């Protein structure tokens, strides 16, 4: 039996055990995991430093290095994320749609775990803790296949979580890390449909496409984040500037950072003059249509079909549009169904934007940076689904479950 087949089968076996574990016990285990991450913070950061040194030697892109980096604050955030998960309702076993048929048969729907979830990701060691905790609380085993860039960090975090599982006499196979980033093993992993129920890839466009095209297992896509801010003709321009700066400059290498700015013609002159000052101060590189480019020094002029880039850097694309409808059309053409933002004081326009724009998160007068499981009350997130089956948007506990029918009778037969 190959390594991958063995890991997958052990994960499936462990999932059956976890599915029957009560909420109180799961929460005790998770609290111990949070405490263990804090206690082993120095060990985790030391292992992460090895990954960072290799990343620098390999000239890894700045955005990827940022995602790879762990420090006291980020390890603490992982622990706090687990504690939030503890505070959330356990979806497993929840009942709804309780009905009784005319023949006396009673019908219910019950939430149940998916089974085995496989995470495929790049330089994101925090995914190890987030996915491990979310899958555990929702009753799923998880198989973690991180990129070579984060291998030591991921193994360190997993080893800490394994020590807690052992303390509670639970199998390590509940949280498995593929120890070798070899592409051939990844291909084999994506064929384990008898053991793995769902694959969630998190990373660049190339990784998402590779997994989607090669997996025989259902895939939920966490696609790139080409997020826009649309500044409406009725916008509060001070609010708009704050949304722009927070969305673009707070942390550039994340999928909920702004990559596009769409401005209504009626306020373009006043607003873009403000943008020219603040974006220059922040060192943001400007790509723009011919009209918007005139407000900026050294702007790169984009053609009509050259928008839609995920920069993951201090860089943004700007377009002036003649109407609300044109803004929605631009977002439909160049967005990635991740997060879209409108700044407006017009309630009717805001409501129409939220109904019209096809994105997993649509915000009004609030930063794109809130498109995150921790910010939306989900605790940690396992991903932000930009495809619509079977989840859409930040995925928390409920997204890691499905429903089955419970049918109870007292001897009825079908006539």
From Swiss-Prot:
A cellular component annotation (GO) from this entry: cytoplasm
Keyword Amino-acid biosynthesis: yes
Signal peptide start-end: none
EC number annotated for this UniProt entry: 1.2.1.41
Pfam families per the UniProt record, alphabetical: Aldedh
Stored InterPro entries: Ald_DH/histidinol_DH, Ald_DH_C, Ald_DH_N, Aldehyde_DH_dom, G-glutamylP_reductase_CS, Glu-5-SA_DH, GPR_dom
Principal place of residence: cytoplasm
This protein's UniProt keywords: Amino-acid biosynthesis, Cytoplasm, NADP, Oxidoreductase, Proline biosynthesis
Top-level EC class as recorded in UniProt: oxidoreductase
Pathway field: Amino-acid biosynthesis; L-proline biosynthesis; L-glutamate 5-semialdehyde from L-glutamate: step 2/2
The reaction(s) this protein catalyses: L-glutamate 5-semialdehyde + phosphate + NADP(+) = L-glutamyl 5-phosphate + NADPH + H(+)
Role this protein plays: Catalyzes the NADPH-dependent reduction of L-glutamate 5-phosphate into L-glutamate 5-semialdehyde and phosphate. The product spontaneously undergoes cyclization to form 1-pyrroline-5-carboxylate.
Family: Belongs to the gamma-glutamyl phosphate reductase family.
The protein's name: Gamma-glutamyl phosphate reductase
Annotated source species: Pseudoalteromonas translucida (strain TAC 125)
């Amino acid at each position: 039996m190959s390594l991958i087949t063995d890991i997958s089968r052990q994960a499936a076996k462990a999932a059956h055990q976890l599915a029957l574990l009560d909420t109180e016990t799961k929460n005790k285990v998770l609290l111990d995991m949070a405490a263990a991450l804090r206690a082993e913070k120095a060990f985790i950061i030391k292992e992460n430093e090895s990954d960072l040194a290799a990343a620098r030697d390999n000239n890894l892109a700045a955005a990827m290095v940022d995602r790879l980096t762990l420090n006291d604050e980020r390890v603490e955030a992982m622990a706090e994320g687990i504690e939030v998960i503890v505070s959330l309702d356990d979806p497993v076993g929840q009942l709804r749609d309780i009905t009784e048929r005319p023949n006396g048969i009673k019908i219910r729907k019950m939430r149940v775990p998916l089974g085995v979830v496989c995470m495929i990701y790049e330089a994101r060691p925090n995914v190890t803790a987030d996915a491990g905790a979310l899958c555990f609380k929702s009753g799923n085993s998880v198989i973690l296949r991180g990129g070579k860039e984060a291998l030591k960090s991921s193994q360190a975090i997993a080893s800490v979580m394994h020590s807690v599982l052992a303390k509670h006499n639970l199998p390590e196979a509940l949280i498995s890390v593929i120890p070798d980033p070899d592409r051939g093993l990844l291909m084999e992993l994506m064929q384990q449909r008898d053991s793995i129920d769902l694959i969630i890839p998190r990373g660049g466009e190339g990784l998402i496409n590779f997994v989607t095209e090669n997996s025989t297992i259902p895939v939920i896509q966490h696609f790139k984040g080409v997020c826009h801010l649309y500044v409406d003709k009725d916008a509060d321009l001070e609010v708009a500037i704050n949304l722009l700066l927070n969305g673009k400059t707070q942390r550039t290498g994340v999928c909920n950072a702004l990559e596009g700015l769409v401005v209504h013609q009626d306020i373009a002159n006043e607003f873009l003059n403000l943008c020219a000052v603040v974006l220059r101060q922040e060192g943001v590189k400007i790509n723009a249509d011919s009209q918007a480019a005139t407000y900026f020094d050294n702007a790169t002029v984009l053609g009509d079909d050259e928008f839609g880039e995920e920069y993951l850097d201090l860089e943004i694309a700007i377009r002036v549009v003649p109407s609300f409808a044109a803004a929605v059309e631009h977002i439909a053409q160049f967005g990635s169904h991740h997060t879209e933002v409108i700044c407006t004081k017009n309630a009717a326009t805001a409501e129409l934007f939220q109904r019209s724009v096809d994105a997993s998160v649509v915000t009004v007068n609030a930063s794109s940076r809130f498109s995150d499981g921790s910010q939306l009350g989900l605790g940690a997130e396992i991903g932000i689904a930009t495809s619509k089956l079977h989840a859409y948007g930040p995925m928390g506990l409920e997204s890691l479950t499905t429903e089955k029918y419970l049918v109870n009778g007292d001897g009825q037969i079908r006539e």
